[in-house]
Amino acid sequence: MTTVTIKPGAMVLADWADIWRGATIRIDPEAKAGVDAAAATVDRLIASGEAVYGLNTGFGKLAQTRIADDELATLQERLVLSHAAGIGEALDSRIVRLVMALKLASLGRGASGVRWTTIAAMQALLDADVLPVIPSQGSVGASGDLAPLAHMSAALIGAGEATWQGQRMPASDALAKAGLKPVQLGPKEGLALLNGTQTSTALALAGLFEVEAGFQAALVSGALSVDAAKGSVAPFDPRIHSLRGHPGQIDVAAALRGLLDGSGILSSHEGCEKIQDPYCLRCQPQVMGAVLDLLRQAGAVLEREANAVTDNPLIFTDTDEAISGGNFHAEPVAFAADQIAMAACEIGSICERRIALLTDPAVSGLPAFLTPNPGINSGFMIAHVTAAALVSENKQKAYPASVDSIPTSANQEDHVSMATHGAFRLLKMAENLHVVVGIELLCGAQGTDFHAGLTSSPTLETAKATLRKQVPAYGDDRYFATDIANARDLVTGRGLVADAGTLPGIA
């Protein structure tokens, strides 16, 4: 099992991808000195008697209410309990682990004022496989992801629900079974745990990684469709793409050339009368390249956000100050999530057009619906309809979340990002995308089978062989849903990407 050491402020996308895929999480012990220094600053601020937001005052609209020193621990505990107001289905355990890892990375920067013992308690939860149950609904993405992170924090203090070794139960029971004790929160700790963009960032990162899997598999399926339709490789000539200069476009064109290199099908129709291919074949570098640039841009934003400190107020140890700001506002995450959603839509859209092309004999020159005996067999007729349905569903889901805002907290929090809403949809969109790409893979493999005596490139034949281990070639009609699910799983598991060698991605 891979272990990712969280080095606050120095994490890269590949680290978060490893955590998403199940890596063990460890906080770097070298972060302790900075954390201890910030906690000491909090202690000095309280001892000074100065009113500091969130340390010895109420929260939000109640910030003018001063809290007595003997009630500071109660203040933090009640903050957690009152803000644990989420609803809806629980987030997947992989998301919860990612949320907790992101929170460790943020707290470990030494600008939040929590004690190292509280960070160690979060680490202990992860080590013992005690994961808070976090409802998926209830955050507007400012002031941070308050409700989801309150549910995460509640498990630390023995409130709410958690899972232990996959079993859902009261958090107090989960802690007991794991041999752990509830945390007694110190000054500012509840606020530091609740305030931040870690839930929306975790959801957006997960969506990014899964859409990237769909993107890379779609390069394989798109290349296979070129061979199935006896399309041309000429539009992928590097000279075309260098004249436009977009990095993603250049990278995608190179990838398609590599995937099709050595194809016997391509060489069999050199000099044919067909002048130009339809856009869904010919313009893959332009469309998928723009998608790649968009995903890379979103990835860069999320990488920065994952390294950020996003609670409030922030603690500056060099001057012993606590300064209130607005790093909790998740607008960058909201924009990134919207970009990822757009990218998922476009990948699926161009894949669906190639499915339509391959199943239409008037355009592809292949048997109707890719069945050797049309009429008695319907072939890929309804598989295409399924792809069309999912592509349209993704279009509906892609409406930008970031353009929405609604005031909350008695108008103190009067502009919000909706980042969590925007990021939550991404995994479902990615799942839909994986199905669509899987269907195109099936169509492309079936289409190339009709070119008797000819083979595709060595790379594509290897990918096709991997697919055929899960889904045999089609003769007469058979139950289709299982084949689609198996093809989808190959996309999700990146099995075909491994066959294809190095393909361009977000990093």
Curated annotation (Swiss-Prot):
One of its GO terms (molecular function) is histidine ammonia-lyase activity. Contains an active site 4-methylidene-imidazol-5-one (MIO), which is formed autocatalytically by cyclization and dehydration of residues Ala-Ser-Gly. Keywords: Cytoplasm, Histidine metabolism, Lyase. Its EC number is 4.3.1.3. It is found in: Cytoplasm. CDD domains: PAL-HAL. One of its GO terms (biological process) is L-histidine catabolic process to glutamate and formamide. Its main location: cytoplasm. There is a cross-link at A142-G144 (5-imidazolinone (Ala-Gly)). The modification 2,3-didehydroalanine (Ser) is found at S143. This is Histidine ammonia-lyase. The lineage of its organism: Bacteria, Pseudomonadati, Pseudomonadota, Alphaproteobacteria, Maricaulales.
